[in-house]
Amino acid sequence: LKGELTEGAGPGIDVYSIRQPLGVVAGITPFNFPAMIPLWKAGPALACGNAFILKPSERDPSVPVRLAELFTEAGLPPGAFQVVQGDKEAVDALLDHPDIKAYGFVGSSDIAQYIYSRAAANGKRSQCFGGAKNHMIVMPDADLDQAVDALVGAGYGSAGERCMAISVAVPVGEETANRLRARLAERIKDLRVGHSLDPKADYGPLVTAAALTRVRGYIDAGVTEGAELVVDGRKKGSDEMTFGDESLEGGFFIGPSLFDHVT
């Protein structure tokens, strides 16, 4: 925020730069971390003297509203932090508004590319973080207990709906692969799916019915395309998985799944 000073840039020439607020900036954030990611965007923007407009995911709109209430209770000036609800129509209105100077986005790669392109076409700055699923390479001398703990926590925590999820493990060597697969399958079958506030549940539901349909479709496609389905999370009530509560039938729940020999 202090800018820079370069003395002696040329004979009798000193160069300095100053930084000033842009004015109004916007954050377009995903459903999976409805408080943390908006605060990533809003905090620096407000600290640098900008007004901030938050467009949260329409899948969980209530948490951002509570953030706005907390900012107001803390004494933030009226209008400095605002929340706009909506879907693509709201996003396009923000991207095209002449008074909004910059955007921050976290979400899927396709939407990141869309927002970046549309903002650039309007001469706006944007910072777009899209698609961050991780891979784990498991070497023959790896601590498999530690590797399995990391894979189970990262792959299935939050029902896999987070950018830090490790969705692919690449074991080096057939022996490593066989040992890793056996340990993973054993651990995965013991995972309990249930209400997110249930302390006995390892993870909760997917965010929407559409998400459940999409994930089931991924499993169906894997089977159709020839991958080996070691643990089938589609089987409710079977030995493949355990639901913590039968009353959860009809919710957006799916058990943990594991594929092998994916090409």
Segments the model singles out, each with a brief description of its role:
Residues G3-V148:
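Rossmann-like NAD(P) dinucleotide-binding subdomain of oxidoreductase/dehydrogenase enzymes
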Residues D96, A102, D110-T263:
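ALDH superfamily catalytic-core signature
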